[in-house]
Amino acid sequence: HLSLRRQRQMCIRDRVYGFYDECMQKYGSANVWKSCCQVFDYLNIAAIIDGRVLCVHGGLSPEICSLDQVRTITRVQEVPHEGPFCDLMWSDPEDIDTWSVSPRGAGWLFGNLVTQEFNHLNGLELIARAHQLVQEGFKMMHDDNIVTVWSAPNYCYRCGNVASVFQVGDLLDTPARPEADREAQDDTQGEPKSHSRFGPSNFKIFDAVPDQDRMLPARNPASQYFL
């Protein structure tokens, strides 16, 4: 299991979403919360699965064309308000061709041609990201070159959405398509197309536990270790 950096970890520092209160309730002090805030700055910005799947929280950046450029980003810092680091955390795929200004005020909206070109240049089959609520748990876009995976059912206890887990394992046992075959197909089609072999069968869908079945954990006394 590998945790990746996301943009809302700055909100945790600001004591949003209840993490600070949970630490105070369980451990009796803010020491655990402070330690977690320090750890967040060291989380990886992105991860690559078997050289085929790029995992990132948000999306792409107009300042990044290759995976090597992602590797050069200094990650031990708070997420900046602009630039490639910010874009990787905040950008979203959209039903457009290239780039557009994001209504979020940070990052960009990027289109089908952007995703196809990035995957083609970097030998990727898929970009897996989160960052946007998807009612069905996952959403394939850009000719199946990118997928949004949402793993929080009934988000904020009111959205009524299902969630999903992306299961990659079986496909990693099969060899990737040779680059020559990819280029041959691209030449016949005139532009990069989808090389993804991922589909609905790769996603495990689950729902929130019904309210009547929820079991609250017993409230244990605060551990002396963290006092």
Predicted segments with their positions:
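Conserved N-terminal structural segment that caps and organizes enzyme catalytic cores in eukaryotes
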Residues: W33-C36, D41-A47
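Short, well-ordered beta-strand micro-motif
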Residues: I48, C55, T148, V165-G169
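Conserved active-site segment immediately N-terminal to the catalytic lysine
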Residues: F40, I146-S151
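Single conserved hydrophobic/aromatic residue that forms the stacking wall/gate
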Residues: H1-R8, I12
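Short amphipathic alpha-helical segments embedded in low-complexity Lys/Glu-rich regions
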Residues: L133-G137, N145
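Divalent metal-coordination and catalytic microenvironments
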Residues: Q7, F40, H57, H131, ...
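Short linear motifs in low-complexity or flexible loops
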Residues: T174-A176, A180, A184, T188
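Active-site-proximal loop/helix segment associated with metal-binding centers of metalloenzymes
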Residues: R13-N31, V53-E125, E136, S151-Y157, ...
